């Protein structure tokens, strides 16, 4: 009898462990000096400081992990969840990465961000001990007249780049782009860029927190000192040519080795339900930009609302999203 009981118990325990999950995630917040209050007022985020510049919605990065906010794993970091349940929850397409591949954020730019650049993997691993950073931006909301910087107007030399930084004339050669709600930008590592004030951005990026500031409007940080610039490293990694206008992502809004992003729009009337499958190849990340409804998979259902971050583990099988939903769906390609 005891053997039968033990075998039954082991079988049930294994099934429980194997049962895939829909995780609602709680973010870490950042109070950078350019942030505002829109993520609190309009997206229900929690703020501990004077402002909320970013929320790291899907993150295993030590500088700001996201936390499981539902079920028996509530309170654990996403990294802890993955360590306990095994890398199979990420999918076979993630096996080529040594670490969790992506980081997703909401960004509230009440003021201009610094002019900056991110290194590629080779440079970042050698000099910073972490991955480089290719990213994409989806403009969730934009005040009238909002803009950002994306690459150069024309190709310049590294020498001219360095000289313009020194002479404070860099903005003259940067590509200033008017921005509207729904715009998408793909920012390859090495592309100089900056988010302007009055923008809410959803960002999908490599799992990295390496930024080289080039120009910061002479601002001081919370310590009263001018924020550090990283001129030498920035000159080394910057591609001094105009950013590529790359339409090869279609039908996705972004598609690269690190992430594939699709846009979902359920209006609640003509289109009020999406049905799909989460295979064993990749997890599915759902970042809800607007709306509310229910996500169901594998016998589990969770409600969602504007601002939520949902993680469906690889191998979850069939799922449905029902209701009103404006969202970014992120997977990892082969």
Where are these regions (language model features)?
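Loop-centered beta-sheet repeat module
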Residues: 164-210
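A short hydrophobic beta-strand segment most commonly corresponding to one strand
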Residues: 135-137, 194-217, 324-334
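Glycine- and acidic-residue-biased ligand/ion/polar-headgroup-sensing regions
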Residues: 109-112, 134-135, 139-157, 161, ...
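Short beta-strand His + acidic residue motifs that chelate non-heme Fe in jelly-roll/DSBH
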Residues: 124-126, 192-197, 202-205, 274, ...
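Short acidic-glycine-tyrosine-enriched beta hairpin
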Residues: 174-185, 298-315
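Transition-metal
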Residues: 2-156, 211, 216-244, 261, ...
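Tight coil/turn sites that cap or link beta-strands
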Residues: 120, 188-190, 198, 269-271, ...
């Amino acid at each position: 009898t005891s053997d039968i009981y033990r075998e039954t118990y082991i079988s049930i325990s294994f099934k429980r462990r194997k049962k895939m999950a829909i995780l609602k995630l709680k973010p870490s917040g950042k109070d950078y000096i350019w942030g505002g209050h829109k993520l609190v007022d309009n997206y229900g985020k929690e703020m501990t400081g004077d402002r909320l510049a970013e929320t790291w919605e899907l993150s295993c990065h030590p500088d700001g992990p996201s936390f499981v906010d539902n079920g028996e794993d509530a309170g654990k970091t996403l990294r802890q969840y993955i360590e306990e349940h095994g890398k199979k929850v990420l999918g076979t397409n993630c096996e080529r990465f040594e670490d969790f591949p992506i980081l997703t954020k909401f960004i509230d730019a009440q003021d201009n961000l610094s002019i900056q650049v991110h290194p590629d993997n080779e440079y970042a691993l050698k000099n910073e001990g972490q991955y480089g950073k290719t990213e994409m931006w989806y403009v969730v909301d934009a005040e009238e007249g909002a803009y950002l910087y994306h690459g150069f107007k024309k190709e310049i030399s590294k020498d001219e780049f360095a000289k313009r930084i020194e002479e404070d004339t860099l903005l003259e050669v940067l590509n200033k782009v008017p921005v509207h709600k729904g715009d998408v930008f793909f920012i390859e590592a090495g592309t100089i860029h900056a988010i302007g004030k009055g923008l809410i951005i959803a960002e999908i990026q490599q799992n990295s927190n390496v930024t080289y500031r080039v120009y910061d409007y002479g601002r001081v940080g919370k310590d009263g000192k001018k924020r550090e610039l990283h001129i030498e490293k920035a000159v080394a990694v910057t591609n001094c040519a105009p950013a590529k206008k790359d339409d090869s992502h279609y039908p996705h809004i972004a598609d690269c080795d690190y992430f594939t992003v699709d846009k979902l729009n359920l209006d609640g009337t003509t289109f009020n339900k999406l049905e799909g499958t989460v295979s064993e190849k990749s997890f599915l990340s759902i970042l809800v930009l607007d709306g509310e409804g229910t996500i169901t998979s594998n016998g589990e259902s969770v409600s969602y609302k504007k601002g939520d971050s949902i993680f469906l583990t690889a191998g979850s099988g069939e799922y449905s999203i029902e209701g009103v939903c404006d969202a970014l769906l992120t997977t990892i390609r082969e």
